[in-house]
Amino acid sequence: MSLPKPNSFRAGPDERGHFGTFGGRFVAETLMPLILDLEKAYAAAKADPSFQKEMNGYLKDYVGRPSPLYFAERLTEHLGGAKIYLKREELNHTGSHKVNNVLGQIMVARRMGKKRIIAETGAGQHGVATATLCARFGLECIVYMGAVDVARQEPNVIRMEMLGAKVVPVQSGTRTLKDAMNDALRDWVTNVATTFYCIGTVAGPHPYPAMVRDFQSVIGHETREQMMAAEGRLPDSLVACIGGGSNAMGLFHPFLDEPAVEIFGVEAAGHGLTNLHAASLAGGRPGVLHGNRTYLLMNEDGQIQDAHSISAGLDYPGIGPEHAWLHETGRVTYLSATDEEALAAFQLLSRLEGIIPALESAHAIAKLSQLAPKRPRDHLMVVNLSGRGDKDVPQVGDILRGRKS
């Protein structure tokens, strides 16, 4: 009797944090002891049944999980073809998938005795989730946010401050997510002993990409159970937007070893792939940023290029290393949607289903017009609705009013 083949798509990373040639731990010597401590603390937490039991309790009673899997009937009729389900992460407490990961990291931070929590944020959803959990557990919270994002995501800035967080506008570089992460890393190096850095996506040095993925995988595990209950079988395809890629990895990972399930990630094409965009797989090449090797937007000299997206949460010049590996292996197909396509999808879902999506999630919705009509009516397609669009209503309103005037 032959042994089963190893689980090739879900076994990573290796002990040094690599997914193929991607990932790793590229950090200052000052941080290495803390990174190793974090790796040990996370491994101990995973092995402790009481940790998972406590986390499951908070996911149920505080976050509001499981999030529904909703059949989008009118959207399905409008597009024709595939039967579209929405995994409704926007109904979580704080309004997005971000809280799944933050809860897990804050629980690890408490096990490590850390009282000061720092975070970076783009759209503000990770910042709001971090501020929320810090308020719940009585921890100091500092959130770094690019000054451009502070201006375009004002509702979330106000929420963070109401929750007791200190929001630090970052004025360097392009004043967006990349620069917020740079300043958060500088803070961490300076305050290693007291501070826990709560990274919001599947990027950064090992063990962050794997840890964030694990905490977000509740999305995919629930989707499997819910689809079996609703349809008696697994979905035929999955679709999710990608900045760093945590909502996508959370949905994708539990399905990676199901070869019959097609998987699509949608990057932000901005003004188009030849101009300002944030599609690092479509328009970038491998390099090192923020502690890991992945695909990055770089110029000929290897300098990081400016990213652009209408969505603050996708406005990042890189992608999580596991996504880079899945791209190179061909297991996941990566597409891209422009600002205009996302804006149209934002309005379409609002009018057809009465659900206002985050601009990030609207990038995934935008690709349905390309994917759904080509598939038969019994094809089951799940789209991760990663966040709600309340935060984007002022920005979208300004854009639409400007076009009417």
UniProtKB/Swiss-Prot annotation:
Protein name per UniProt: Tryptophan synthase beta chain
GO cellular component, one term: cytoplasm
Quaternary structure note: Tetramer of two alpha and two beta chains.
Record GO terms (molecular function): tryptophan synthase activity
Function noted in UniProt: The beta subunit is responsible for the synthesis of L-tryptophan from indole and L-serine.
Principal EC category: lyase
Modified residues (N6-(pyridoxal phosphate)lysine): K98
Cofactor(s) the record lists: pyridoxal 5'-phosphate
UniProt keyword terms in alphabetical order: Amino-acid biosynthesis, Aromatic amino acid biosynthesis, Lyase, Pyridoxal phosphate, Tryptophan biosynthesis
NCBIfam families for this protein: trpB
InterPro entries in the cross-refs: Trp_synth_b_CS, Trp_synth_beta, Trp_synth_beta/beta-like, TrpB-like_PALP, TrpB-like_PALP_sf
Listed transmembrane segments: none
Pathway: Amino-acid biosynthesis; L-tryptophan biosynthesis; L-tryptophan from chorismate: step 5/5
Catalyzed chemical reaction(s): (1S,2R)-1-C-(indol-3-yl)glycerol 3-phosphate + L-serine = D-glyceraldehyde 3-phosphate + L-tryptophan + H2O
Gene3D superfamilies, A to Z: 3.40.50.1100
Keyword Lipid metabolism: no
Family statement drawn from the similarity comment of this UniProt entry: Belongs to the TrpB family.
